[in-house]
Amino acid sequence: MATHNVHSCEFEVFGRVQGVNFRRHALRKAKTLGLRGWCMNSSRGTVKGYIEGRPAEMDVMKEWLRTTGSPLSSIEKVEFSSQRERDRYGYANFHIKPDPHENRPVHEGLGSSSSHHDSN
C-alpha cells in the first residue's frame, strides 16, 4: 500500500557541526517531527543526511538545519539536494549512521598482517 504526500531530500550542513552533538540534536528534532532517514559525520567535516516525511514537517526540519542545530554548533550553510516526492517511506525511523572513519585500525598499514598497501 502506497503512502501519499511523502517528500524527501538529502542535506549537508557546513560549519562547526562535528564534535558539538549536532547529530544527536538532529535525531531528536527529526523524531519529534515524525521524520525518517539518517545523518552522519562526513570526512569533509560536515554533517550529511537524508530526511523524508510530510512537507510541513520537512520545512520545519530544513529551517532547523539552517538556523538552529545544536547549542554549540555554528552553521555556515546548508545544501539541500535530490528533493522529490515519493510513493512511500524508505526508512522505518531516523537514525545516526557511524562515522566513515570509525572502525579503522589505529596503525593502519603497520605490521606484516596488514593487507593495506599505499600506492603513492
Swiss-Prot record:
Segments of skewed composition (Basic and acidic residues): 96-107
Organism: Drosophila melanogaster
Transmembrane segments: none
Chain positions covered by the region annotation Disordered: 91-120
N-acetylalanine modification, residue list: A2
Top-level enzyme category: hydrolase
Pfam families given in the database record: Acylphosphatase
Protein name: Acylphosphatase-1
Keywords carried by this UniProt record: Acetylation, Cytoplasm, Hydrolase
Gene that this polypeptide is encoded by: Acyp
Family, per entry: Belongs to the acylphosphatase family.
Broad class of where this protein is predominantly found: cytoplasm
Activity response to pH changes: Optimum pH is 5.3-6.3.
Compartments in which it is found: Cytoplasm
EC number from the UniProt entry: 3.6.1.7
Residues forming the catalytic site: R23, N41
Segments forming domain Acylphosphatase-like: 8-98
GO cellular component, one term: cytoplasm
GO molecular function, one term: acylphosphatase activity
Catalytic reaction(s) noted: an acyl phosphate + H2O = a carboxylate + phosphate + H(+)
Keyword Cytoplasm applies: yes
